[in-house]
Amino acid sequence: MTYIVLDLEWSQPVCREKMRIAGTRVLQVEIIQIGAVAVTDGIVSEDFFSEYVRPRYYTELKGRIKKLTGITKNDLKNAHDLTVVLKSFRKWLEKFGKDVIIVTWGPDDIPTLVKQCEFYERDTGWLPEWF
């Protein structure tokens, strides 16, 4: 069994009026980094995943986000968009086979990832079981 410890960082609209809406889908936050490490048989792997994501809509980082994450606008300037980073993350996950469970530090990471995929009309069927 391999546990993937996932941590997402995200940006927010600067105000409620700037929140992005597409039909019935609302983009409350936008992922700006995906980080993960594998733990197999209680051993933390040296193999990890960490990529910045270039935001499409919430490009202005609030001071609180910069302070909390240490991520700057410059870090995101040359990053790939979410679609490309998700493909890379999915490929990274595949090396661990089917016996994988995703765990997170908090309750928001997986729902945020799922909502982002839904907003951008991306499949979520590839996501392994998660807690």
Where are these regions (language model features)?
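Conserved non-catalytic scaffold segment of RNase H-like nuclease domains
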Residues: T2-P111
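Substrate-recognition/cap helix-loop segment adjacent to the acidic, metal-dependent catalytic center
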Residues: D108-W130
